[in-house]
């Protein structure tokens, strides 16, 4: 029987982007939830290039006496998942919990995730109950979940919920992956041997607005498709092959009909022209698909730019500068 590693310290990573209204309540409730764990803990708040007072508020909270807050300040906005990866690079805990800053997933759920991870799970996911989102957000989330499940074969119910817990070896494995487009729940599940989901409460957003606009959701879907699989490129080749075969079949049929019914039936070769045109269009799609396959692989290999740049890390009694945190 595999021995379950004990959890001595819990790290909570929270990406923050223009959340100055919710920060005081977020810090208070997250700290209170962590105090109930009976374990050592730290709370890493990653400012993802906020344009409001979020960064200065995080720095002040981190410098307070007795604070468990670590403020990780990025130089600009890199997106939710890259901000979380920046936080991962500075965690010191055995179990890492991720949480959104909007308080729609209550921090009070953290002890439940830690208790479930204590049972030996590598990844503890969550499923939002009675989601307090718009109809469009719910439908988009359901579509994305189905896309991920069909592509990865992992039957997880709610990939969009970022309230999750990961064992330290899962975090270390993800940090060794250097692709620029990262979707953390999917990446974590590729390394997890044991994963489980538990239901959690979902509240209405009290402060500000959602940072995921319609276009950002569309971009997220494209990122998911391109970072998960090269199937769309292969489907392009398949589609081109089908068109080419149909064009060739039509050409043969037209030749037979011309022989059987004479040249008048073939409209002076117009139908034959279309048949040949379909053949060439199909061949072009096949060629484009093959080129796309190679370009996609080259693109995957050369994506070596940093996912984020940490400008400053502020914790109780210490401040590190950007020179120490280039990623």
UniProtKB/Swiss-Prot annotation:
Major subcellular site: membrane
Keyword field: Antibiotic resistance, Cell inner membrane, Cell membrane, Glycosyltransferase, Lipid A biosynthesis, Lipid biosynthesis, Lipid metabolism, Lipopolysaccharide biosynthesis, Membrane, Transferase, Transmembrane, Transmembrane helix
Pfam family for this entry, one: Glycos_transf_2
Gene3D superfamilies assigned: Spore Coat Polysaccharide Biosynthesis Protein SpsA, Chain A
Topology class, membrane: Multi-pass membrane protein
Catalytic activity: UDP-4-deoxy-4-formamido-beta-L-arabinose + di-trans,octa-cis-undecaprenyl phosphate = 4-deoxy-4-formamido-alpha-L-arabinopyranosyl di-trans,octa-cis-undecaprenyl phosphate + UDP
TM segment ranges: 236-256, 270-290
Localization per record: Cell inner membrane
Pathway assignment: Glycolipid biosynthesis; 4-amino-4-deoxy-alpha-L-arabinose undecaprenyl phosphate biosynthesis; 4-amino-4-deoxy-alpha-L-arabinose undecaprenyl phosphate from UDP-4-deoxy-4-formamido-beta-L-arabinose and undecaprenyl phosphate: step 1/2; Bacterial outer membrane biogenesis; lipopolysaccharide biosynthesis
GO CC list: plasma membrane
Enzyme's top EC category: transferase
UniProt record, GO biological process: 4-amino-4-deoxy-alpha-L-arabinopyranosyl undecaprenyl phosphate biosynthetic process; lipid A biosynthetic process; lipopolysaccharide biosynthetic process; response to antibiotic
EC number(s) on file: 2.4.2.53
Family under the similarity heading: Belongs to the glycosyltransferase 2 family.
Stated role: Catalyzes the transfer of 4-deoxy-4-formamido-L-arabinose from UDP to undecaprenyl phosphate. The modified arabinose is attached to lipid A and is required for resistance to polymyxin and cationic antimicrobial peptides.
Name under which the protein is recorded: Undecaprenyl-phosphate 4-deoxy-4-formamido-L-arabinose transferase
Organism encoding this protein: Enterobacter sp. (strain 638)
């Amino acid at each position: 029987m595999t021995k379950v590693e004990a959890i001595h310290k819990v790290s909570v990573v929270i990406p923050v982007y223009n959340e100055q209204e919710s920060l005081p309540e977020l810090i208070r409730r997250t700290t209170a939830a962590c105090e109930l764990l009976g374990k050592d803990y730290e709370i890493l708040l990653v400012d993802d290039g906020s344009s409001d007072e979020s960064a200065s508020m995080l720095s002040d909270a981190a410098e307070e006496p007795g604070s468990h807050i670590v403020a990780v300040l990025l130089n600009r906005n890199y997106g939710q998942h890259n901000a979380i990866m920046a936080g991962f690079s500075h965690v010191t805990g055995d179990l890492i919990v991720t949480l959104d800053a909007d308080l729609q997933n209550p921090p009070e759920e953290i002890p439940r995730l830690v208790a479930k991870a204590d049972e030996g799970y590598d990844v503890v996911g969550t499923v939002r109950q009675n989601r307090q989102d718009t109809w469009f957000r719910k439908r988009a989330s359901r579509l994305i979940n189905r896309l991920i499940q069909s592509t990865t074969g992992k039957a997880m119910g709610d990939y969009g919920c970022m309230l999750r817990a990961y064992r330290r070896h899962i975090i270390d494995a993800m940090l060794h992956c250097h692709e620029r487009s990262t979707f953390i729940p999917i990446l974590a599940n590729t390394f997890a041997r044991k994963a489980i989901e538990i239901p959690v409460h979902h509240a209405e957003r009290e402060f500000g607005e959602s940072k995921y606009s319609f276009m950002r959701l569309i971009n997220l879907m494209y990122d998911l498709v391109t970072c998960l699989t090269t199937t769309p490129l292969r489907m392009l080749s398949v589609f081109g092959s089908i068109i080419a075969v149909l064009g060739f079949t039509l050409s043969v049929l037209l030749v037979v009909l011309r022989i059987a019914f004479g040249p008048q039936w073939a409209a002076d070769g117009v139908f034959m022209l279309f048949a040949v045109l379909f053949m060439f269009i199909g061949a072009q799609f096949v060629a484009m698909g093959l080129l796309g396959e190679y370009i996609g692989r080259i693109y995957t290999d050369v994506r070596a730019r940093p996912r984020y740049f940490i400008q400053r890390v502020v914790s109780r009694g210490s401040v590190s500068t950007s020179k120490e945190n280039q990623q």
